[in-house]
């Protein structure tokens, strides 16, 4: 299930929240959202997940279990503020090397400053680039991670193929993303929280509810767990699986390049 579609006029369209936009229009719109929330991104994730994103991210890093080797290289995509990369570096005993890639310079600036304050900048590289066109040679990384970012990519299938290309043989893909709630009653509560509470909290915290409204809508437009797993397989990955967190509010997807 690709996110890209042919419009009635023959052009390629994708979703920006509940709006249909041209494929080329989505990235600037997404960039504007994250320029607005960059300095409060972690607070935004707390609002979006009621703080559970921290538990989910820790579970993601536990699943990756990065070894304490200096030649272990991870590419963390859409990871501008460094939240995942920092966890990887610390879990490896400050041995692993993490490249943080984001298309948004504001997010990367926040991440680079945080890395300096933590004293781990030697283990990190910050790269401003597009997930659909990675500036790296094939077979460069041992792992590719992306947390709460893949749904913002205009052409998800292209980004997945790029992930496959830059991974080494035996490399692992891990995608953490909001997903489809699979627990009865929880889905109703989550819908009420998402559409009523999250934009209001967002406006209270940042003065602007529009970025939060988009993010809530983008979750609903993202493929469900099984459809997204099929997209990962279509990109060439093997041993594809997913694990639901908190009844399916989020899911961790895994695939291997073998």
Swiss-Prot record:
EC category: transferase
List of residues binding S-adenosyl-L-methionine: 81, 102, 130-131
MF annotations from Gene Ontology: 2-methoxy-6-polyprenyl-1,4-benzoquinol methyltransferase activity; demethylmenaquinone methyltransferase activity
Catalysis: reaction(s): a 2-demethylmenaquinol + S-adenosyl-L-methionine = a menaquinol + S-adenosyl-L-homocysteine + H(+); a 2-methoxy-6-(all-trans-polyprenyl)benzene-1,4-diol + S-adenosyl-L-methionine = a 5-methoxy-2-methyl-3-(all-trans-polyprenyl)benzene-1,4-diol + S-adenosyl-L-homocysteine + H(+)
GO biological process: aerobic respiration; menaquinone biosynthetic process; methylation
UniProt pathway: Quinol/quinone metabolism; menaquinone biosynthesis; menaquinol from 1,4-dihydroxy-2-naphthoate: step 2/2; Cofactor biosynthesis; ubiquinone biosynthesis
EC number, UniProt record: 2.1.1.163, 2.1.1.201
InterPro entries listed in its UniProt record: SAM-dependent_MTases_sf (IPR029063), UbiE/COQ5_MeTrFase (IPR004033), UbiE/COQ5_MeTrFase_CS (IPR023576)
Pfam families cross-referenced by the UniProt entry: Ubie_methyltran
SUPFAM superfamilies per the UniProt record, alphabetical: S-adenosyl-L-methionine-dependent methyltransferases
Keyword Cytoplasm: no
Keyword terms, alphabetized: Menaquinone biosynthesis, Methyltransferase, S-adenosyl-L-methionine, Transferase, Ubiquinone biosynthesis
Family stated for the protein in its record: Belongs to the class I-like SAM-binding methyltransferase superfamily. MenG/UbiE family.
PANTHER family xrefs: 2-METHOXY-6-POLYPRENYL-1,4-BENZOQUINOL METHYLASE, MITOCHONDRIAL, METHYLTRANSFERASE
Role: Methyltransferase required for the conversion of demethylmenaquinol (DMKH2) to menaquinol (MKH2) and the conversion of 2-polyprenyl-6-methoxy-1,4-benzoquinol (DDMQH2) to 2-polyprenyl-3-methyl-6-methoxy-1,4-benzoquinol (DMQH2).
Name assigned to this protein: Ubiquinone/menaquinone biosynthesis C-methyltransferase UbiE
């Amino acid at each position: 299930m690709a996110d890209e579609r042919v419009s009635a006029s023959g052009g390629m369209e994708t979703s920006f929240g509940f709006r249909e936009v041209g494929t080329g229009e989505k990235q600037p719109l997404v960039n504007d959202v994250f320029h607005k929330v960059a300095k409060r991104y972690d607070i935004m994730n707390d609002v979006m997940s009621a703080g559970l994103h921290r538990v989910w991210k820790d579970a993601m890093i536990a699943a990756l279990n990065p070894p304490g080797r200096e030649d272990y290289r991870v590419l963390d995509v859409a990871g501008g503020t460094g939240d995942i990369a920092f966890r990887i570096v610390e879990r490896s005993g400050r041995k692993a090397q993490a490249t943080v890639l984001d298309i948004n310079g504001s997010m990367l600036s926040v991440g680079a400053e945080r890395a300096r304050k933590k004293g781990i900048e030697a283990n990190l590289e910050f790269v401003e680039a597009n997930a659909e066109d990675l500036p790296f040679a094939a077979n460069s990384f041992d792992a590719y991670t992306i947390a709460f970012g893949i749904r913002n990519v205009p052409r998800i299938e292209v980004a997945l193929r790029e992930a496959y290309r830059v991974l080494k043989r035996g490399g692992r893909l891990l995608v953490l993303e909001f997903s489809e709630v699979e627990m009865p009653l929880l889905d109703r509560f989550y819908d009420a929280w998402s559409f009523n509470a999250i934009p209001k909290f967002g406006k209270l915290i940042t003065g602007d509810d529009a970025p939060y409204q988009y993010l809530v809508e983008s979750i609903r437009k993202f493929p469900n767990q099984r459809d997204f797993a099929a997209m990962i397989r279509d990109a060439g990955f093997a041993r594809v699986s997913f694990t639901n967190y908190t009844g399916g509010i989020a899911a961790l997807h895994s695939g291997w390049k073998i």
